[in-house]
Amino acid sequence: MQKFPYYAITVRRYNVLFRHTDWLKKTQELYNEILLFYYRLYLETFPDQQPGTQEALRILETLTIVGRDKQPVPAPLPWKKIPLYFRRAAINTATAAAKSYLARGTQEHPTEKFTESVTFYKGMYRDFQDNTISLKLWNGESWQWSRLRLRGNTVPEAGQMMSPALVLTKDRAELHIPWKLPVSDGRSARERITAEENICSVVFTGQDTCAVCCILNADGRRENSFFIKGGSRYAGACRQITEKLDKSREVQGGGENPRANAHYWERLRNIHDHYAHQFSRQIIDYCKTQNARILVLPEFDKDYSQIILAAAGRNSPIRLIPSIREKLKYKAWQEGIVVVEIQQHQISSVCSQCGAKIRRKGGDFLCQNGHRGNRYLNMAHNLGQKCLDGFAATAD
């Protein structure tokens, strides 16, 4: 297997077309029964000291699987002829769940039932092509190699396929396939600053122009700017759905219960995800166009962000900001762009050209020395300059 010095992992989702949908459900049910068995065994075996994942796998298999010596084991696996890699996938998932339970003090009782998606290790899948794959499935009586048709996504031109997961939802089956993709540039932010690469600083407005990008060169001079619009479209699309949701509540009731109007809540989530993906992709594409290898974002305090989101309207573009930031981080790394977060202190109160105090009026600013312009672009410039100054100070 080829090794990449720098890589990113992305997940491609495919819709599964398969005649025997009951086989998919039976395979998942068996997987979760085995998972629960090993979850309980792990908690009994390692109540205090927790070994590493590989060591836990070895010990749990020793306790449950008869070896070559044919000697009885303390806790034999209740199921017969379970494929090796199917069992190991369940053990690793059980180990992760048990460690999570032991690490938390808030969960009083261990989990009684699992509904995890099945992870197929090598040996449980084969013959993957653009639109088909073979999975080893349990039909209730025996294991069968089954050919599944896939729809809805493409195969990356480069990279390595990792273990797929079968995800069953209420009305469909999906196959989620992680791909390890090579990253062309894995240098640190300091190495890029030393090489005098351009930087792109971004501030979020929560308005129709939801993000403002500013390109600075190594000397701090502004080279370009980009205003990303679409916040009003997002708010309008959400408003249409929330109005229908409110009417449905009046007629059918249900309060805040998401299941009462599940299709409306799903549409809201889809709209949110669509615009977050769209805006983050525009920022990354702009960085690539301007050859900016560092993306500077304002640092967000989690508690403060929750206060702002609580105060914002339910259709406000402000609600997109956390999702855009999250997507920017992994999309930037995939493109060989490194993300740096800088504190926002004073970026909105001084002029980016002379450092004098400014007065704000709507979306514009005016400084004591007569400089004026868009205040969000001024903030983005100050944020980028603060990044450059910070690296320069630590280099001295």
Which sequence ranges carry the predicted segments?
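Generic detection of short hydrophobic beta-strand segments and adjacent strand-loop junctions
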Residues: Q2-F18, S142-G152, F226-G230
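Stable alpha-helical structural segments in soluble proteins, enriched in small hydrophobic residues
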Residues: I34, A89-Y101, L377-C387
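Generic structural motif
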Residues: R12-V16, G123, W138-G140, N153, ...
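Positively charged, helix-rich recognition surfaces that bind polyanionic ligands
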Residues: L175-D396
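Gly/serine-rich nucleotide phosphate-binding loop at the start of the catalytic core
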Residues: M1-N92
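Residue-level signal for secondary-structure boundary elements
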Residues: N32-Q50, K99-T106, G253-E256, N291-L295, ...
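Broad gene-expression machinery/nucleic-acid interaction feature
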Residues: Y6, D130-S134, W145, R172-H176, ...
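Acidic carboxylate diad motif detector
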Residues: Q54-R172, P182-V183
